[in-house]
């Protein structure tokens, strides 16, 4: 049934709680009943449905922020959502090799409905406290879709989207993301190294309180999405503490990263704050902006965001492999302790430490922001061209920043971490290269178009 305006009761579709307790057959029957029941209504629709991939990328961003997920945890969440949406959409009209779920959907199933349900199902699993608002959004999305698609097609798409989300969720349940059983305290956790120079330890808070234990040590050994192992592109060790390059990095931080009396301009202080938010979400906003401008199709969007977010997830795993391999100290520790007593500056405070987040609670090398951003920039440059202009907003600082290329953006992100006083420049530059290497690998090994037979065996070892 297709008409201009529908008022629905979408109650049957509210498979609240743990949806996996409802059998597939019973669930599908309920969905079919629902979509054809166009009577009493709690949802009003008067406009055509938007692209559900872009719509639910926006819903995902909102849910991640509301859920308070860290940038590290967010890389896994956005990959779960985008992988599910991609395999759901591609499974109905297979144009690419699947990431995980073999295409097995009814040919009449709605790709749009499948995308909506796949994204919804993952988000409710990750953020059960948001199930009511997510369900309301899902119902509105399906109601808008019924303006242009038949009820049986929508029902089949919803059932397929749920099937794919269940499969992706089950696949990644055993990826090693469970929190570590014991806190990681850096040199205090490494036998024979307590107090050793150059090694990370919990960094003091701006208010003088003790710092938190290392965040996400389990990510260092998490099963990657596409990489064969977390260490596939492991970086060389950090700069030697007695090297001139390290001295250059350290001196730059002393002047440019300090809270007060720095050599920063106002714009440099602002950009450090601007980029202090949830990095994966910045790149999803950028991708959505460019997709809209270029008019990408549903399938193209599903593929783009899956490549983007799976690449960022594997980049984060590769980054954490390096962090917990080398356990390198943060600038605040390096500058306060010094290599010698004469070199120490115990009163030094980084610019970002008086703002939410401050110095991140994990080892310094390599930079997480720069690794993830290098990965994202590689994927988006491949899709839209390196010298593509775009702008981006921040959830933690007002204003909009604009760029003429993706390299310009990643260079500014490196500046932001240095000017914030939380990363050495070399760490950011090497991290950017790491992220690009990961994204290149992912794009050549996963979700390739049928007929794309690029040789990729040489870098599997």
Where are these regions (language model features)?
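Short, flexible coil/linker elements and helix-boundary hinge sites characteristic
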Residues: 15-16, 41-42, 146
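Acidic/polar surface patches and capping/hinge elements
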Residues: 48-453
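Alpha-helical and His/Cys-centered functional microenvironments
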Residues: 10, 35, 373, 460
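N-terminal secretory signal peptides that target proteins for export/translocation
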Residues: 1-25
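Sec/Tat signal peptide C-region and signal peptidase I cleavage site
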Residues: 43-47
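Glycine- and aromatic-enriched low-complexity segments, predominantly in secreted/extracellular proteins
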Residues: 452-461
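Structural motif marking the loop-to-transmembrane transition
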Residues: 25-26, 111
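Bacterial N-terminal signal peptides
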Residues: 29-41
């Amino acid at each position: 049934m297709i008409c201009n305006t529908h008022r629905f009761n979408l109650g049957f579709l509210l498979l609240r709680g743990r949806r996996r307790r409802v059998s597939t057959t019973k669930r599908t029957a309920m969905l079919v009943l629902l979509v054809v029941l166009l009577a009493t209504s709690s949802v009003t629709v008067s406009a055509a449905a938007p692209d559900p991939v872009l719509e639910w990328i926006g819903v995902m961003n909102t849910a991640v922020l509301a859920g308070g997920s860290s940038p590290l945890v967010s890389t896994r969440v956005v990959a779960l959502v985008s992988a599910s949406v991609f395999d759901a959409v591609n499974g109905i009209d297979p144009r690419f090799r699947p990431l995980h779920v073999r295409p097995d959907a009814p040919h009449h199933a709605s790709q749009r409905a499948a995308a909506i349900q796949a994204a919804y199902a993952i988000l409710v699993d990750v953020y059960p406290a948001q199930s009511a608002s997510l369900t309301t959004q899902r119902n509105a999305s399906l109601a808008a879709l019924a303006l242009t698609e038949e009820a049986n097609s929508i029902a089949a798409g919803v059932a397929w989207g749920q099937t794919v989300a269940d499969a992706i969720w089950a696949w990644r349940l055993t990826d090693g993301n469970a929190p570590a059983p014991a806190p990681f305290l850096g040199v205090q956790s490494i036998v024979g190294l307590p107090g050793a120079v150059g090694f990370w330890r919990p960094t003091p808070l701006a208010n003088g309180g003790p710092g938190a234990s290392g965040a996400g040590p389990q990510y260092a050994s998490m099963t990657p999405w596409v990489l064969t192992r977390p260490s596939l592109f492991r970086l060389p060790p950090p700069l030697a503490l007695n090297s001139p390059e390290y001295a250059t990095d350290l001196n730059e931080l002393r002047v440019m990263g300090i809270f007060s009396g720095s050599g920063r301009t106002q714009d440099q202080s602002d950009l450090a704050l601007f980029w202090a938010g949830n990095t994966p979400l910045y790149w999803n906003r950028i991708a959505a902006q460019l997709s809209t401008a270029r008019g990408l199709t549903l399938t193209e969007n599903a593929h783009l965001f899956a490549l983007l977010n799976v690449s960022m997830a594997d980049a984060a795993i590769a980054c954490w492999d390096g962090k917990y391999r080398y356990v390198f100290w943060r600038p605040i520790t390096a500058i306060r302790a010094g290599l010698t007593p004469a070199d120490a500056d115990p009163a030094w405070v980084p610019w970002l430490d008086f703002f939410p987040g401050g110095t991140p609670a994990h080892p310094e090398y390599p930079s997480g922001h720069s690794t993830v951003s290098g990965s994202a920039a590689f994927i988006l440059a491949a899709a839209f061209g390196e010298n593509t202009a775009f702008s981006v907003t921040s959830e933690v600082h007002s204003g909009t920043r604009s760029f003429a290329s993706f390299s310009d953006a990643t260079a500014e992100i490196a500046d932001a971490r240095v000017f914030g006083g939380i990363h050495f420049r070399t760490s950011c530059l090497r991290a950017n290269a790491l992220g690009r290497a990961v994204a290149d690998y992912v794009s050549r090994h996963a979700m390739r178009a049928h007929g794309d037979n690029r040789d990729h065996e040489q870098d599997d070892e």
